[in-house]
């Protein structure tokens, strides 16, 4: 295939970046940077870098499993050393051990023996059982005095159990934890060990240490010869030794170094200097919106607030308002006034300062009324020590020569820190003095270090370098930006450097999982509100034809908020005429042409005649507010008595009016992710456009507005192509286009949501969508065909899925626009990032009994709280215990097969006389088990977990699939058995040298399967090991095809053709994979 070599193109690249997708579009521009032609577009889809259901890091499951393996391994090694010690000290002889090094005939009643050891001499085997039991179950050892103040619920429950049991031992009713366990736990709850999620039976390791010492003393009294000092010291060391938590230099090594001072470590966030830096950043960036103008705090206002966070545990916006003496018409920029009591939220909290202060107060070392009497340098040292070190011993070692012993003891009891900032204390101490003078962070950095981002690489390159992981800590954002980089470089590689890059990031990008869930919750609430409003609208207007549109519902909503009156004239609005054409209009109170503000807070309901009279003025200008006219006073009264939110009232009543500021805020997205990406691209990438600002972050609200004006229909639920639709709009949002729209709106005195304008000279009603400035003629029709491969509104139309078909369709439908047909026109094919990772979960967590595996059955112990009716039917010994089966079934049926509710109360067996006997907590259930992973020395079996690869072989015009699991990769096993439908793995087809290797499949590899019935072309989703069939994901995940965009159960063994393809990030270069040798698994 010949290389693609386009002619030089002057174009803008538009990007629509989400947390799992990047839509892109190239729009050619003329010399004045007006969009003139759609060159190319596409979508890149990838898996978000988090667990979808929980938002946890993808590494968390591995990290937790690794921690469990380490704990198990360390426990096993501890017991091994204990057995060796027992043998070395003569407690046990060689004959007491089996071939695996385990002790033969070891008593299995260690709790009882621990109690008996207080009153009689134990035999060597009994004494060994006691010592090994103490080392195996050695309780909890706290290394910090303040752990009891944790916010972690699980740790809190554990610490409570430890404290309660320590208190019970101190009462003197029980000599040792073993006596407490036997005489209290076992008698009261029927068990000694902790049960699921319960930590009330946990002991302190120090209490177990005291028991060990007492047992040695008692056994010595009873004449036990095996109580030497060496044995006691060795056992006590094994009991008490614990690996220290990662701290000190190890923590600093992981954190890295300062952005500005590369030789310096990053500062702890809970130091005095770091907290002051954070406060000064907020203070110097705080903006007041008043009468339409935006201003920073004056020097006097800054001085008023400067020390308030030290005086108050939390400084709120409401408190700041009172201290500054702000008028009711003034508001804090960036605060969401739509929610209740917005100013009750915290402006600044000096957490470390007040934590230290409270700690000293609790121990009587500080006067409640006096400020904290510790120097900033000492507070920095305290914050650093408590952040870096994790044990009282290490913290004491760092601070003992700096702080009085009683102060250090108070701090150890009550504080704990663990967060860091990106800058060192050395850099902060240089930057903070300038910020105290009123300079912003970037200004202070520029004065000292020359740049906000430290030493910036200003070399412009053709391709964008990798996104620095140390600057973008959120893995979800890092993956999204990294994929966007791949798309940018792919476009440059194919078409050359762009003139400009326009970026829009979805609002969830950069948000935490919790915040994104809150956004989803609000969206769902808004959807329900719209449904209620639509239902209410239909009640008011039962004869309304069709479904009410958002504009209709908005009219009713505004009508109610304005008490049924025109906001401009005060005249009553006839509700029955609400839908009458031209009777009422939705107006932008602050003219759209001067603000680009299309938010709800800028919309009011007025009579059509009033709207035309107001024209391009603000209400303040229209009603002659500068002379405080009677009309202005009446208007103010109507606004104040309306049901508008406070922020909307303030906006409508604006007097001073900063047009440039409004436009800048509404046209640009200034979130950190956008600022970072724009700066990163602008600093490092060669762009050919005019002027300095060649990278622009578009506001999503403006994209939505323009998409509607330009007639582009977006349905997210249909498929993944809609991301490209937004990218086209983002690319076309040029400065020249914005100026055209502004001039049009100003000239026509338009209403942005009325759908019509009035020509003043002729009085003719002009339909807005016809006359609203378009990037080019037939823009909407061309874009919809390019994105979806068919005309808009014609789902039955066959998709033009080849360049020839697409060009023919464009030529037929847009005969008046020959420019739409050019050499770069190709169908949109969604590119999906393949997952070629070969590691993963080795096997499922549940280990089942393998005693009956030769029957194809495994046995699993299922807790009653997880037992469903379908599981109950497979209960072991169901025929032998019919009463138990019937009782369990009745309980489940009574609670509609909800085991959590059914067995919230304990369940007991009953004897023939009807007396309650044994509590049942779980039952054994049979499961079909044809394969799995052997564990626990072939005593248990677990289900396979991740199928990381499928190798495809061919022989005699038939295809054979060999699944490869992560556990096989870990062991270096390259399987040689191909799936045979309905057979056990041992009976699968053996792959020998007579088979030809074709290719390896990973999730999201592009494949083509041709059968006698159809051709299927899409992304490999999964393979069914029971049937040998595969599932293929449609490239755009069109939900109308297959099952939610997935073609399931495709048999490939007898396929006419089965081929794997390579695809680039843009979805443009698609070619068959070359034949290779079968790759190893490691």
Swiss-Prot record:
Protein residues bound to Mg(2+) 2: 16, 508, 723
EC number(s) stated in the UniProt entry for this protein: 3.1.-.-
Signal peptide, first to last residue: none
Biological processes annotated in GO: defense response to virus; maintenance of CRISPR repeat elements
Enzyme's top EC category: hydrolase
Subunit-structure text: Monomer. Binds crRNA and tracrRNA.
UniProt xrefs under NCBIfam families: cas_Csn1
Protein name: CRISPR-associated endonuclease Cas9
Gene: cas9
């Amino acid at each position: 295939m010949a290389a693609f070599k386009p002619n030089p193109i002057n174009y803008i690249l538009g990007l629509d970046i989400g947390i799992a997708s990047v839509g892109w579009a190239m729009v050619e521009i003329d010399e004045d940077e007006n969009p003139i032609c759609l060159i190319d577009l596409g979508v890149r889809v990838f898996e978000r870098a988090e667990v979808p259901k929980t938002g946890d890091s993808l590494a968390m499951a591995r990290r937790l499993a690794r921690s469990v393996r380490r704990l198990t391994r360390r426990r096993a090694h501890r017991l091994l050393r204990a057995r060796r010690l027992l043998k070395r000290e003569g407690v046990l002889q060689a004959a007491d051990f089996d071939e695996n090094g385990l002790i033969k005939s070891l008593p299995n009643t260690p709790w009882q023996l621990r109690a008996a050891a207080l009153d009689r001499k134990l035999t060597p085997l009994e004494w060994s059982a006691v010592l090994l039991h103490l080392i195996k179950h050695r309780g909890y050892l706290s290394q910090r005095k303040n752990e009891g103040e944790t916010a972690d619920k699980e740790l809190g429950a554990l610490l409570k159990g430890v404290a309660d049991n320590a208190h019970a031992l101190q009462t003197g009713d029980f000599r040792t934890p073993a006596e407490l366990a036997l005489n209290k736990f076992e008698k009261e709850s029927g068990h000694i060990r902790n049960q699921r999620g319960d930590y009330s039976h946990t002991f302190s390791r120090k209490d177990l240490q005291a028991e060990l010492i007492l047992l040695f003393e008692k056994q010595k009294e009873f004449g036990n010869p095996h109580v030497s000092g060496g044995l006691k010291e060795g056992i006590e060391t094994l009991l008490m030794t614990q690996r220290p938590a990662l701290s000190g230099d190890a923590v600093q090594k992981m954190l890295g170094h300062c952005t500005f001072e590369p030789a310096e470590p990053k500062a702890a966030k809970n130091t005095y200097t770091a907290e002051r830096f954070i406060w000064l950043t907020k203070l110097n960036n705080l903006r007041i919106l008043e009468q339409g103008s935006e201003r920073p705090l004056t020097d006097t206002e800054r001085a008023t607030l400067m020390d308030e966070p030290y005086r108050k545990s939390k400084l709120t916006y409401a408190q700041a308002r009172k201290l500054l003496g702000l008028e009711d018409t003034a508001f804090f920029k960036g605060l969401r006034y739509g929610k209740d009591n917005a100013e009750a939220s915290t402006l600044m909290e000096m957490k470390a300062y007040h934590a230290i202060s409270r700690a000293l107060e609790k121990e009587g070392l500080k006067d409640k009324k006096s400020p904290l009497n510790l120097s900033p340098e000492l507070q920095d040292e305290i914050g650093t020590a408590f952040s870096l070190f994790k044990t009282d011993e290490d913290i004491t070692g760092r601070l003992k020569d700096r702080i009085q012993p009683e102060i250090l003891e108070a701090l150890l009891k009550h504080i704990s820190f663990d967060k860091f900032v990106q800058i060192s204390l050395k850099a902060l101490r240089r930057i903070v003095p300038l910020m105290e003078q009123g300079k912003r962070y970037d200004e202070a950095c520029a004065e000292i270090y020359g740049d906000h981002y430290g030493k910036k690489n200003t070399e412009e390159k053709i391709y964008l370098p990798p996104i620095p992981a140390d600057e973008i800590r959120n893995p979800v954002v890092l993956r999204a930006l990294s994929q966007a980089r791949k798309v940018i470089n792919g476009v440059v590689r194919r078409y050359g450097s762009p003139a400009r890059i326009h970026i829009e990031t979805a609002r969830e990008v950069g948000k935490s999982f919790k915040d994104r869930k809150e956004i989803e919750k609000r969206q769902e609430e808004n959807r329900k509100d719209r449904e209620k409003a639509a239902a209410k609208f239909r009640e008011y207007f039962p004869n309304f034809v069709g479904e009410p549109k958002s504009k209709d519902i908005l009219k009713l909503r505004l009508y109610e908020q304005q008490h049924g009156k025109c906001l401009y004239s005060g005249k009553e609005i006839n509700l029955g005429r609400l839908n009458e054409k031209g009777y009422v209009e939705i107006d932008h109170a602050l003219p759209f042409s001067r603000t680009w503000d299309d938010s709800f807070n800028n919309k009011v309901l007025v009579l059509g005649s009033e709207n035309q009279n107001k024209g391009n003025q603000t209400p303040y200008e229209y009603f002659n507010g500068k002379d405080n006219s009677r009309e202005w006073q009446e208007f103010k009264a109507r606004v104040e008595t309306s049901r508008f939110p406070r922020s909307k009232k303030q906006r409508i009543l604006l007097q001073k009016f900063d047009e440039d500021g409004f436009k800048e805020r509404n046209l640009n997205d200034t979130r950190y992710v956008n600022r970072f990406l724009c700066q990163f691209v602008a600093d490092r990438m060669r762009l050919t456009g005019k002027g300095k600002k060649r990278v622009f972050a578009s506001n999503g609200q403006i994209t939505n507005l323009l998409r509607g004006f330009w007639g582009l229909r977006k349905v997210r639920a249909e498929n993944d192509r809609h991301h490209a639709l937004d990218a086209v709009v983002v690319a076309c949002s040029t400065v020249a286009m914005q100026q055209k729209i502004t001039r049009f709106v100003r000239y026509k005195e338009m209403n942005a949501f009325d759908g019509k304008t009035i020509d003043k000279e002729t009085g003719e009603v002009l339909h807005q969508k016809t006359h609203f400035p378009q990037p080019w003629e037939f823009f909407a029709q061309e874009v919809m065909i390019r994105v979806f491969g068919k005309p808009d509104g014609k789902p039955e139309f066959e998709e033009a899925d080849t360049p020839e078909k697409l060009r023919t369709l464009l030529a037929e439908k847009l005969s008046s626009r020959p420019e739409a047909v050019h050499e770069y026109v190709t169908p949109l094919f969604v590119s999906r990032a393949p997952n070629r990772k070969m590691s993963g979960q080795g096997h499922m967590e549940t280990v089942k009994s393998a005693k009956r595996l030769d029957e194809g059955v495994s046995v699993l112990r299922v807790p009653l709280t997880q037992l469903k009716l379908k599981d109950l039917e497979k209960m072991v010994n169901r025929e032998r215990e019919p009463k138990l089966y019937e009782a369990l079934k009745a309980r489940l049926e009574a609670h509609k097969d909800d085991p959590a509710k059914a067995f919230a109360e304990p369940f007991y067996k009953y004897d023939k006389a009807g007396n309650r006997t044994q509590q049942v907590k779980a039952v054994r259930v049979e499961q079909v088990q044809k394969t799995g992973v052997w564990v626990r020395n072939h005593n248990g079996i677990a289900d396979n977990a991740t199928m990381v690869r499928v190798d495809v072989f061919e022989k005699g015009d038939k295809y054979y699939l060999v699944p490869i699991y992560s556990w096989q990769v870990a062991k270096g096993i390259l399987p040689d058995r191909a799936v045979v439908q309905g057979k056990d793995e041992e009976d699968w087809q053996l792959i020998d040298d007579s088979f030809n290797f074709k290719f390896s499949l990973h999730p999201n590899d592009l494949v083509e399967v041709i059968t006698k019935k159809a051709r299927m072309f899409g992304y490999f989703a999964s393979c069914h090991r029971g049937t040998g069939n595969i599932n293929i994901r449609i490239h755009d995940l069109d939900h109308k095809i297959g099952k939610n965009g997935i073609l399931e159960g495709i048999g490939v063994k007898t396929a006419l053709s089965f081929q794997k393809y390579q695809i680039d990030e843009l979805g443009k270069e698609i070619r068959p994979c070359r034949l290779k040798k079968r790759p190893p698994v490691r």
